[in-house]
């Protein structure tokens, strides 16, 4: 029970922080336009109709496809989270699901995901992203690292 409550709290905190950051950045952008944080980082406004890196942004009915796909992935991860006995795995999955729900909320409300972090070196730009993308990526990396560690311990 404790694992479930903590997981739900983590999920909601991640989702809320994502939505708050997007609201704050949209207001900041409306007042100031693009903002240079430091030489390699700008805060911008980009509406991503595709998936990661803007892939498939021109896909016909893409938003509907991505919403359904997101919902299926969220359901699978939520089921996995419920079944896991590990608090750390549950928290990782909650971070991933919270980020995915944050981006899904954007798709439902705006028809696209709001990205605002632009990292670049000279003219080369990493695709813009947001806090939800960051939490999903970190959650996946930590989850995979835990799984690899678990498997190496089982094989030792």
Curated annotation (Swiss-Prot):
Cystine pairs: none
An MF annotation (GO) of this entry: aspartic-type endopeptidase activity
Any GO BP: proteolysis
Transmembrane segments: 62-82, 126-146
GO CC, any one term: plasma membrane
Active-site residues, Swiss-Prot/TrEMBL: 115, 133
Membrane topology: Multi-pass membrane protein
Pathway: Protein modification; lipoprotein biosynthesis (signal peptide cleavage)
Location(s) in or outside the cell: Cell inner membrane
Catalytic activity: Release of signal peptides from bacterial membrane prolipoproteins. Hydrolyzes -Xaa-Yaa-Zaa-|-(S,diacylglyceryl)Cys-, in which Xaa is hydrophobic (preferably Leu), and Yaa (Ala or Ser) and Zaa (Gly or Ala) have small, neutral side chains
NCBIfam families: lspA (TIGR00077), PRK14775.1 (NF011357)
Family: Belongs to the peptidase A8 family.
Protein name as it appears in the record: Lipoprotein signal peptidase
Protein species of origin: Anaplasma phagocytophilum (strain HZ)
């Amino acid at each position: 029970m404790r694992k479930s409550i903590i997981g739900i709290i983590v999920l909601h905190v991640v989702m809320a922080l994502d939505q708050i950051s997007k609201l704050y950045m949209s207001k900041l952008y409306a007042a100031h336009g693009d903002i240079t944080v430091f030489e390699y980082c700008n805060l911008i406004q980009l509406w991503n109709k595709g998936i990661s890196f803007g892939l498939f942004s021109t896909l016909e009915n893409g938003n509907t496809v991505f919403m359904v796909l997101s919902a299926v992935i969220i359901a699978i991860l939520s089921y996995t989270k419920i079944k896991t006995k590990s608090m750390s795995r549950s928290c990782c999955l909650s971070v991933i699901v919270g980020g995915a729900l944050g981006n899904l909320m954007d798709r439902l409300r705006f028809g696209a995901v709001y990205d605002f972090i632009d990292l670049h070196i000279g003219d080369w730009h990493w695709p813009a992203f947001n806090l939800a993308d960051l939490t999903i990526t970190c959650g996946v990396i930590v989850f995979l690292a835990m799984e690899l560690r678990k498997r190496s311990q089982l094989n030792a």
